[in-house]
C-alpha cells in the first residue's frame, strides 16, 4: 500500500502544508485537529476493502465526528485557504473567429466575465439543508496566459473554507466567456486528506449557451447507496442533464445522450435511388439503436431523418467528439480528404480507357510508380491535404503513390497459394467466421419453399481425395474438417445484388482440411445462385485444380469466397458486432451511471470516441451511395444484410470463449489454462485472444469483487440495474424479448457482462480492424467486390475466358477506380492516431480513481498485458507455429497490445475509436 499511498497523494501532505500558511486569517492546522477527524479524512481517502468493513467503520467514525461537531464546531470552527490547480488544454489550431473571440475573452476576463469555481462538500450544511459550499473563486491570470502556445495551461484559484467543511466531493464551474474551453483536470490542495483530484476531460460551454453550472465529481468512486449526503442531489441532477427530454434538434455543444433508429442513412429527397429502408423498430428489419440527433424529417418521407452532409459535422454529445490530435489524424483531415478531394480526383483521372487493371504490373505500379492524376486536380490544394500515409506522396508529374501492403512484404506471391488463402481464415483480418464442420454435407437453414433445397451440392467424391486417406466420417470424427459458410447470409440477396450494374456474387461455402502439421488447406468451394426453376442448376462445386483451366477457375472461385468474406467481415463481424451493438451500452452508461459510479469509471476508457466514429460512419461510410456501398459486393443492400445478421446476434455468445465453443473451434477443458481446448492448436487469433480475454477477466473480477462482495449489492444497485435494463429494453429493444439475455443478479453475472464489453471494444475490434489495409490493400488478395461470375462451358463468355484467362480474372476484380478508392479508405480505417490509448493504459493512470487498491490492481493488469505482448512476440518467432512463422509468413500481431501511430497491423486500443 505504500506505493498506492504515494500515488494517491498522501505523502504530499507535508509538501502542501506550507501553502496553508496565511497572514490574513486563522489557519487550520492538521496537527491540532482532533485525531478522530484526521483519521477519518485519511481512511475515507484510502481504498475500500469490503462493504461490511466500510459500513462498520463509517458508523463508528461518524459517531466520533458527530460528537466532536457538537462540542467543537459552533465555537471553534476556523477558516483556512485551499488552492485549485486547473489544467486547461489549448487548441493547436484556431480559425480566425476563434482567435478573435479568444482575445475578447482575455480582455473581458479582467472585468468580471470570467471563469468561476465553487467547491461542494460531501457533507450537508445543517443550516441550509443543502451541501456545504465554499465561496466562489475566480480562475486567476486567464488574460495573462491566454496567448501561451503550450499544449496545456495551468491556472489557479483560491477558496476559503471552514475546518468543518469536510471533504470536497464535487466542484462546479461557470464559464462566463464567449467560447468553450477544454477542462482536463482540477486538483485541490490544502485539505488534511491530501490532494483531491477531479478528472474532468470535458468541454465547458459558455454560460450564455448553457446557463447551468457544470458539475465535476472527485475521483473517489461511490455506489449509489453510499453517495455522501452532500452529493446525492448533484449526482441525480447530472444524470438528468445528460438524459435530456427527448425533444428538439440537438446542438453540437449539447451533452445529451438519447436513442433513435437508423433512419438517416438514405436521402429520399435526392431521388428513389438514394432512399434506404429504416433499420430498427420493425420486426422484419431489427437493429440496435443509435445516438439521437433530433433532426427534422425529409420532405419526401416523414419517417426518414434529414441528413447532415459532409463536410458539416453530425451530432454526437460534445465530449464524444474527437480530440484535436485524433481529428487531425482521422476525422476532419484524413477521411474527409479522401472522400472530398482524393476520390473525386481519382474519378476524374481514371477514364473509361483504363477502367480495368490490365495485369499484375498495373497493381504493382500503384506502389512502385504511382497513379497519374489528371492535370490540374493535384494543384496546391490537393498537395497540402493531410492525406493518409498510404498515399505516400504527390510528386512532380502528378503521381499518387500507395504504400506497399504488408501481405506483399515477405512474399509477393503468397496470396496466390492455397495455404495462405486458408491461413488467413484463422490469422487474417476476419478470423471469426471459420467453424468446425459438424456434419457433411452442410445444410442450409433457409426456408426451402423460398430458396430451394437445403442440401448442399457437395459430395464425398469432391473431397475424398484430399483427406490423407481418411473417409469423410473419419475426418469429421478427428476434427479435421472446417468450413467458412456464407451461404445463408448472401443467398436471400443474390437476385437483387446480381441485378446491380457491375456486381456479381455467389453464396459461398469453403471446406478446409487440417493437416498433420497444423495448417489448413482448402479442398472444395461451393458456389450457389438462386434457383430460377425446378430443373435449373443453381449450385456448382470447384475443387483444387489439376489442369491450367481448372487453375484459373479455382483462382476466380477463391476470389468470390474472399469477396463474400470481405462483406461479412465488414457488415457483420466488424460494423454490427463491434460498432453498432456497443452503442446502446454506451448511451445507457452515460444516461444511467453517474461519473462517480465505479462501473462507469471502469468502462470509461472503453467508450472513448465510439459514438463519434459511428456518427461519422452513418454520414460517410454506410450511408446511401457511401463508401461501403460503393466498395462492397452487396452495394445498396449492404445494411440490409447487416440487419438480417442482427436477428441472429446474441450478446451471451459474444465473449471469446463462448464464441469459440459456438463455432466448434474449442471445447471446454478444465485442464487447459483458459478452460478451453482449441481444435486447431495453432489458431493465432484464438490463442492470443484467450490470453487477453483472461487478463481482462482477471482485472474485471478484482474490480467487481472489490465493490460487490455479494449478490445483494449487485441487485440493490439501482444505477447498475437501470443501465443494463435500458440497454436491453431501449437500446436493443428489437431483441428485448429474447431469452438468451444474461441476467444481472450476481457478481459473476456482472464480471461476465463487463468482460465481454471490454473484450469487444478492445481486442475483438482490433483483430477485425487494423489488418484491413495490410491484407486488403492488395486487391487480388482480398477483393471487396466481384464483377463477373465464372462462365460455364455453355456460356458465350467461356471462349473469352479460355482465350485470355488473366484478362478475364482482372475484369472480374474491382475496377481501377473501385480499387484505388477502396485502398485509400481502408488505409485510413487501419490507422492508429497519435493519442491512441491502448489496453493496459489510462489517461492519468494514477488519479483516474481515488481508490488506492484499485490503482494497484490496474497496474497489475497493465503488467500482465505487457507480459502477454512478450509472449506474442515469442510465438511469432516459434517455427513450430506455422500459421504465424515461416518463409514468407506474416507474424500474427493484430492482438499485440501496443503500437506506434499509423498503419502498423498491430495494437489493441481501449475502445472502438476508428
UniProtKB/Swiss-Prot annotation:
Disulfide bonds: none annotated. Induction: Up-regulated locally and systemically 30 minutes after wounding. Up-regulated by jasmonate and abscisic acid treatment. Not induced by pathogen infection. Optimum pH is 6.0. One of its GO terms (molecular function) is oxidoreductase activity, acting on single donors with incorporation of molecular oxygen, incorporation of two atoms of oxygen. One of its GO terms (cellular component) is chloroplast stroma. It is an enzyme of class 1 (oxidoreductase). It is found in: Plastid, Chloroplast stroma; Plastid, Chloroplast thylakoid. Fe cation binds at residues 574, 579, 765, 769, 914. It catalyses: (9Z,12Z)-octadecadienoate + O2 = (13S)-hydroperoxy-(9Z,11E)-octadecadienoate; (9Z,12Z,15Z)-octadecatrienoate + O2 = (13S)-hydroperoxy-(9Z,11E,15Z)-octadecatrienoate. Binds 1 Fe cation per subunit. Keywords: Chloroplast, Dioxygenase, Fatty acid biosynthesis, Fatty acid metabolism, Iron, Lipid biosynthesis, Lipid metabolism, Metal-binding, Oxidoreductase, Oxylipin biosynthesis, Plastid, Thylakoid, Transit peptide. GO terms for biological process: fatty acid biosynthetic process; lipid oxidation; oxylipin biosynthetic process. PANTHER family: LIPOXYGENASE (PTHR11771). Plant lipoxygenases may be involved in a number of diverse aspects of plant physiology including growth and development, pest resistance, and senescence or responses to wounding. Required for the regulation of wound-induced gene expression, but is not involved in the bulk production of jasmonate upon wounding. Catalyzes the hydroperoxidation of lipids containing a cis,cis-1,4-pentadiene structure. Linolenic acid is the preferred substrate, before linoleic and arachidonic acids. Depletion of LOX-H3 by co-suppression-mediated gene silencing leads to higher tuber yield, but has no effect on the number of tubers per plant. Belongs to the lipoxygenase family. This is Linoleate 13S-lipoxygenase 3-1, chloroplastic. It comes from Solanum tuberosum.
Amino acid at each position: 500500500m505504500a506505493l498506492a499511498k504515494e500515488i494517491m497523494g498522501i505523502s504530499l501532505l507535508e509538501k502542501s502544508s506550507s501553502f496553508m500558511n496565511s497572514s490574513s486569517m486563522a489557519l487550520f492546522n492538521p496537527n491540532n485537529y482532533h485525531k478522530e477527524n484526521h483519521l477519518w479524512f485519511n481512511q475515507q481517502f484510502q481504498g475500500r476493502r469490503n462493504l461490511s468493513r466500510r459500513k462498520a467503520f463509517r458508523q463508528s467514525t461518524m459517531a466520533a465526528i458527530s460528537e466532536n461537531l457538537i462540542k467543537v464546531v459552533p465555537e471553534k470552527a476556523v477558516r483556512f485557504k485551499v488552492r485549485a490547480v486547473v489544467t486547461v488544454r489549448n487548441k493547436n489550431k484556431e480559425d480566425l473567429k476563434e482567435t478573435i473571440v479568444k482575445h475578447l475573452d482575455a480582455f473581458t476576463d479582467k472585468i468580471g466575465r470570467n471563469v468561476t469555481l465553487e467547491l461542494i462538500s460531501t457533507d450537508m450544511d445543517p443550516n441550509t439543508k443543502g451541501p456545504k459550499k465554499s465561496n466562489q473563486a475566480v480562475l486567476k491570470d486567464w488574460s495573462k496566459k491566454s496567448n501561451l502556445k503550450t499544449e496545456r495551461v495551468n491556472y489557479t484559484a483560491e477558496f476559503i473554507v471552514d475546518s468543518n467543511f469536510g471533504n470536497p466531493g464535487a466542484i462546479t464551474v461557470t464559464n462566463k466567456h464567449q467560447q468553450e474551453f477544454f477542462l482536463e483536470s482540477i486538483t485541490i490542495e490544502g485539505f488534511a486528506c491530501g490532494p483531491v483530484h477531479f478528472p474532468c476531460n470535458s468541454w465547458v460551454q459558455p454560460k450564455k449557451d448553457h446557463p447551468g453550472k457544470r458539475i465535476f465529481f472527485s475521483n473517489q468512486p461511490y455506489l449509489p447507496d453510499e453517495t455522501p449526503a452532500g452529493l446525492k442531489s448533484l449526482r441525480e441532477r447530472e444524470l438528468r442533464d445528460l438524459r435530456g427530454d427527448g425533444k428538439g434538434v440537438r446542438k453540437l455543444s449539447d451533452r445529451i445522450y438519447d436513442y433513435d433508429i437508423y433512419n438517416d442513412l438514405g436521402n429520399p429527397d435526392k431521388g428513389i435511388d438514394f432512399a434506404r429502408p429504416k433499420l430498427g423498430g420493425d420486426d422484419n428489419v431489427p437493429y440496435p439503436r443509435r445516438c439521437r440527433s433530433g433532426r427534422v424529417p425529409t420532405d419526401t418521407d416523414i419517417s426518414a431523418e434529414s441528413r447532415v452532409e459532409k463536410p458539416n459535422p453530425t451530432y454526437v454529445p460534445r465530449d464524444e467528439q474527437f480530440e484535436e490530435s485524433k481529428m487531425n489524424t482521422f476525422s476532419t483531415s484524413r477521411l474527409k480528404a479522401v472522400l472530398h478531394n482524393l476520390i473525386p480526383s481519382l474519378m476524374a483521372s481514371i477514364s473509361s480507357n483504363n477502367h480495368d487493371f490490365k495485369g499484375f504490373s498495373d497493381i504493382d505500379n500503384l506502389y512502385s510508380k504511382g497513379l497519374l492524376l489528371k492535370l490540374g486536380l493535384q494543384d496546391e490544394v490537393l498537395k497540402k491535404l493531410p492525406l493518409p500515409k498510404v498515399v505516400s506522396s504527390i510528386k512532380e508529374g502528378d503521381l499518387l503513390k500507395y504504400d506497399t501492403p504488408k501481405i506483399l512484404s515477405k512474399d509477393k506471391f503468397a496470396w496466390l497459394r492455397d495455404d495462405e488463402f486458408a491461413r488467413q481464415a484463422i490469422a487474417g483480418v476476419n478470423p471469426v467466421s471459420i467453424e468446425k464442420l459438424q456434419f457433411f454435407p452442410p445444410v442450409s437453414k433457409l426456408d426451402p419453399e423460398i430458396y430451394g433445397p437445403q442440401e448442399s451440392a457437395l459430395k464425398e467424391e469432391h473431397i475424398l481425395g484430399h483427406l490423407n486417406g481418411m473417409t469423410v466420417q473419419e475426418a469429421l470424427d478427428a476434427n479435421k474438417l472446417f468450413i467458412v459458410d456464407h451461404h445463408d447470409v448472401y443467398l436471400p440477396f443474390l437476385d437483387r445484388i446480381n441485378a446491380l450494374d457491375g456486381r456479381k456474387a455467389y453464396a459461398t461455402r469453403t471446406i478446409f482440411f487440417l493437416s498433420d502439421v497444423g495448417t489448413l488447406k482448402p479442398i472444395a468451394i461451393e458456389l450457389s445462385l438462386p434457383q430460377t426453376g425446378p430443373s435449373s442448376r443453381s449450385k456448382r462445386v470447384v475443387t483444387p485444380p489439376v489442369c491450367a483451366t481448372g487453375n484459373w477457375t479455382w483462382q476466380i472461385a477463391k476470389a468470390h469466397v474472399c469477396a463474400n468474406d470481405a462483406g461479412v467481415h465488414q457488415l457483420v463481424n466488424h460494423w454490427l458486432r463491434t460498432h453498432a451493438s456497443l452503442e446502446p451500452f454506451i448511451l445507457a452508461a452515460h444516461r444511467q451511471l453517474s461519473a462517480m459510479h465505479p462501473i462507469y469509471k471502469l468502462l470509461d476508457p472503453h467508450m472513448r470516441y465510439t459514438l463519434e466514429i459511428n456518427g461519422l460512419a452513418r454520414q460517410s461510410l454506410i450511408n446511401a451511395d457511401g463508401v461501403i456501398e460503393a466498395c462492397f459486393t452487396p452495394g445498396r443492400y449492404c445494411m440490409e444484410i447487416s440487419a438480417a445478421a442482427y436477428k441472429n446476434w446474441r450478446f451471451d455468445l459474444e465473449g471469446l470463449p463462448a464464441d469459440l465453443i459456438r463455432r466448434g473451434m474449442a471445447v471446454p477443458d478444465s485442464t487447459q489454462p483458459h478452460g478451453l481446448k482449441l481444435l486447431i492448436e495453432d489458431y493465432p487469433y484464438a490463442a492470443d485472444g484467450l490470453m487477453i480475454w483472461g487478463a481482462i477477466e482477471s482485472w474485471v473480477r478484482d474490480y467487481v469483487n472489490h465493490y460487490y462482495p455479494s449478490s445483494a449489492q449487485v441487485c440493490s444497485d439501482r444505477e447498475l440495474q437501470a443501465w443494463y435494463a435500458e440497454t436491453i429494453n431501449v437500446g436493443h429493444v428489437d431483441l428485448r424479448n429474447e431469452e438468451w439475455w444474461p441476467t444481472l443478479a450476481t457478481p459473476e453475472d456482472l464480471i461476465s457482462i463487463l468482460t465481454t464489453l471490454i473484450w469487444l471494444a478492445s481486442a475483438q475490434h482490433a483483430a477485425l480492424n487494423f489488418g484491413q489495409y495490410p491484407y486488403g490493400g492488395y486487391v487480388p488478395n482480398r477483393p471487396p467486390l466481384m464483377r463477373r461470375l465464372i462462365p460455364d462451358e455453355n456460356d458465350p463468355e467461356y471462349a473469352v475466358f479460355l482465350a485470355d484467362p488473366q484478362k478475364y480474372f482482372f475484369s472480374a476484380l474491382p475496377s481501377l477506380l473501385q480499387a484505388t478508392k477502396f485502398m485509400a479508405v481502408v488505409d485510413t480505417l487501419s490507422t492508429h492516431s497519435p493519442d491512441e490509448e491502448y489496453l493496459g493504459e489510462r489517461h492519468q493512470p494514477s488519479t483516474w480513481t481515488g481508490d488506492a487498491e484499485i490503482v494497484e490492481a490496474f497496474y497489475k493488469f497493465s503488467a500482465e498485458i505487457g507480459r502477454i505482448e512478450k509472449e506474442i512476440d515469442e510465438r511469432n518467432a516459434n517455427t513450430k507455429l506455422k500459421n504465424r512463422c515461416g518463409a514468407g509468413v506474416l507474424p500474427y500481431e493484430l492482438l499485440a497490445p501496443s503500437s506506434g501511430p499509423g498503419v502498423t497491423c498491430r495494437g489493441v486500443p481501449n475502445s472502438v475509436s476508428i
